[in-house]
Amino acid sequence: MDSHVLAFPIPDPSTPPPEEASLYASKCDYYESDIYSQIRRLTEEKCIETEKELPVNIKLHVKHKGMSISSSRNELVVTVSGNYKNVYTAKIKILQAIPKILISKLVLEEPLENLLFDEDGYVYEDTMKHLDKITEITGAKIYIMHRSMCHDIDFQLRTDSGFSNRLNEQQSFYQRHLESTRHEFSCQKNAENSFFIVFYGDYCSVEHARIRVLALMDEIRGLSVVAIATSVSFQPILVGKAFSSTAGMKATESINIYTLPFCSDSIPRLQTLPALNSSKIIITGEEEKLQRLEEAFYYAEEHLKLFTHVTEISFVKLFEFLAYEMDELRLIMEENSSFIRFPEYFKEGGETSPENSKVKIYSSSIANSEKTALRLAKLASKYVQGKTQFGVEDNEDFLRVAGSWRRASTIEKGVSSSELSSIVSSTGSIVETNGIGEKMSFSPLKKLSIPPTEFVAQIAIICMASGVEMLLKTNGIEYFGQENTVPIAMDKASKIFYKFGQSQWHQILLEAPTKDQDFISGKKNGKLDKVKQQCRFNLKNGDILFCPQSTSIFTVDIYSDELERVIKGMNTMLLEFPAEMHFYVPEEIHKKLIGFRGEQIQRVTKLYNSYIEFSTTPFDCYGHNVLIRTPSKFSENLWAVRSLFIKTAEGLGYDIPKYLFAN
């Protein structure tokens, strides 16, 4: 079997805030002062352990020995040599042992500040004891810092997940955007005197500590605190915005509902950290109301009807989700009252087939499960795949069947195509049957004898420079990363490996929700044809194809013999991807905005090159009933249309709350 070399970066840990700049720092022995050295040592140990378990060769590459990670990213890169299945199994085992260390914050409102500090501005001793206890239970280090000392800190988590139902909608919005909208609410004076509670650790530890601190603040205010034992998979469904209000479990001004991380069993943590239990919902409020709410929870859980939706997402993208998108995944679940279950191998870290990437969505309604699948598809579209093929000599055979390269790579991995049935003949040529059953034969891509193991250092350097995951095979390279990093890696690799083939074919795969396909391609493929014309694609030098991947996702396949043309095609296609906005306008003035026979709204859509839809039922859980969509190249028009409609509503005497403005 052909040898492969897989290079992937280890998530960089965040630098902890300086204790000398904080008003308080909890006692925590779980993280070393040099967190980079701790992660590096942990990675080395896991690489040695994995190399003993699997028939692979593993090397750990360090960019700068002793260099501070604050000045350089992608410090650690692991390369694994072996067959296709083993290199990805090794990757799973290694990444499942390396936690992503990050920083989160909680903005203290003025009433809360008075509960934590005495008249002289010092933190109460009892408060420090409580925070030290939370650190001991969760494993997250806690700081109290003045806002002026937090400018250089890279906060990597949202401040709204875990309590989307906290208080009422207006108060929830205020909590989520307290820091970013202080100027809008004319609170600059308070902003200069505000304080942050900063949390440092892995995702689960940080989120458990943050929710416990919120419950502690409520307890200091005199509210009762109750923990309700609930299955993790039921929590986002029961307390999500799309279900809780109809079940009578929505938070009020006197009741707060907090949820813990839903996918904690799939997220790596340090072995020395205390075990955490996410199977509970924390509610705070008046004791009598909490008792009624607790009964409502048990009743809803017993009579809950679940709907299941299965979608497929590349297993490589699922890794990125668990490493960098956990907060967004949690928010998607909360907003759509759904639970996303990942494949079991993410929990076990064992051997798996990389093609097994089915994700199950459980929700309270079919509509919510479909919305969740759509949000996942949009999240997946942030990441792109690239390929470089060496030694392709016969361009006509390569292009004879549309997308033959894509199918050839599918055959190589042992995956059958849904559109064409393919077999490999005894002579090594590929035989396909077209839609009417006729056989079509063409020559396979030439296999070069490139020894991948001799170029481990080269792909490790490219991986460090770009942060892109790379897979080197005997006749090509595969890339995975974001749209701004994959072209960089492809360019560097093509220059290093140019000697292995005068003819290099390049390919970039973009993903998008199936419902956006008509929007991206345009009427009668007008937008697609225009992009091909701008980038000078023709049958001989490449093409852009739309290929269905699953019921919810399709792939934009861009390939050519010139890398510059492929990159230009990718950038041009991304400008045609939709940008959208939801906001609220009173239903009473919808007809006025539309105008007689739609003349008014048609003028607006033509002026701002946008699609506008009004609805009597909200598009999301925030009550927004207006949807605007436009190509990404005109994304600034979204705000112009929103401003026009809001001003029209206010001119007619309607007062629209700011928390319903846009999302």
Swiss-Prot record:
It is found in: Cytoplasm; Nucleus; Cytoplasm, Cytoskeleton, Microtubule organizing center, Spindle pole body. One of its GO terms (biological process) is meiotic cell cycle. Keywords: Cytoplasm, Cytoskeleton, Meiosis, Nucleus, RNA-binding. One of its GO terms (cellular component) is nucleus. The keyword Cytoplasm applies. It comes from the Eukaryota. It holds the Pfam family KH_Mug60-KHD4. Residues 578-644 form the KH domain. One of its GO terms (molecular function) is RNA binding. Has a role in meiosis. This is Meiotically up-regulated gene 60 protein. It comes from Schizosaccharomyces pombe (strain 972 / ATCC 24843) (Fission yeast). The gene is mug60.
